[in-house]
């Protein structure tokens, strides 16, 4: 369990470094903007989603860290093959996030920027799901749980899922509808939110 916890912690930290540091720096070199946006005027929904997301990430990374520190957390004993699959899923999630951020270019931002409307991106991974970066976040959270299967891992995944659902449904999708109108609505009818075909919308406000 200690080895798997070490692998999980390295992969979890690696995901954060690649997605939130390396890729934004590469974006800054290409476009002059890193995508980091201060959400000073964030709504209550956005603030809540951000807080819950940070909580989920904290649970996700503290789970293997506590195991490495010697805490005897309740856990499920999965076959080694499940842990190997988790490691592979984590690596794949990093690749998906990096590819998604590359396709977004200047449209990738850490928060809604009401003063600078970004183009609607529907190419690459966005042809399959509307939020591939969020899909990668959830996949990485699931991967960490497969490597270190404890109640904390399940809680981390559920909190992250709740946070991303709130962020997309209450913050980002209404913004995209206001900015892109029928173009976004047509796109949302055809492409799923986090998984292919799942989360497609048939009308405004859903």
What are these regions (language model features)?
Residues 1-115, 119-122, 140-206:
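Membrane-anchoring alpha-helices and their flanking helix-loop junctions
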Residues 122-138:
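Membrane-interface loop-to-helix entry segments
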């Amino acid at each position: 369990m200690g080895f798997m916890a070490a692998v999980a912690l390295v992969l979890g930290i690696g995901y954060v470094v690649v997605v939130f540091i390396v890729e934004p720096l590469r974006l800054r070199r290409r476009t002059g903007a890193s995508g980091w946006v201060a959400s000073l005027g964030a709504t209550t929904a956005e603030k809540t989603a951000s807080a819950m997301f940070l909580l989920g990430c904290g649970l996700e990374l503290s789970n293997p860290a506590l195991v490495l520190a010697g805490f005897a957390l309740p856990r499920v004993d999965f076959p080694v093959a499940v842990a190997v699959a988790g490691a592979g899923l984590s690596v794949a999630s990093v690749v998906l996030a990096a590819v998604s951020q590359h396709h977004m270019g200047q449209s990738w931002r850490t928060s809604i920027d009401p003063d600078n409307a970004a183009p609607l991106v529907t190419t690459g991974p966005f042809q399959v799901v509307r939020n591939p970066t969020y899909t990668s976040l959830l996949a990485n959270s699931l991967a960490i749980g497969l490597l270190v299967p404890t109640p904390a891992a399940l809680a981390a995944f559920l909190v992250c899922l709740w946070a991303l659902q709130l962020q997309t449904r209450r913050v980002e999708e209404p913004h995209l509808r206001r900015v892109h109108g029928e173009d976004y609505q047509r796109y949302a009818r055809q492409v799923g939110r986090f998984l292919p075909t799942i989360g497609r919308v048939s009308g405004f406000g859903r």
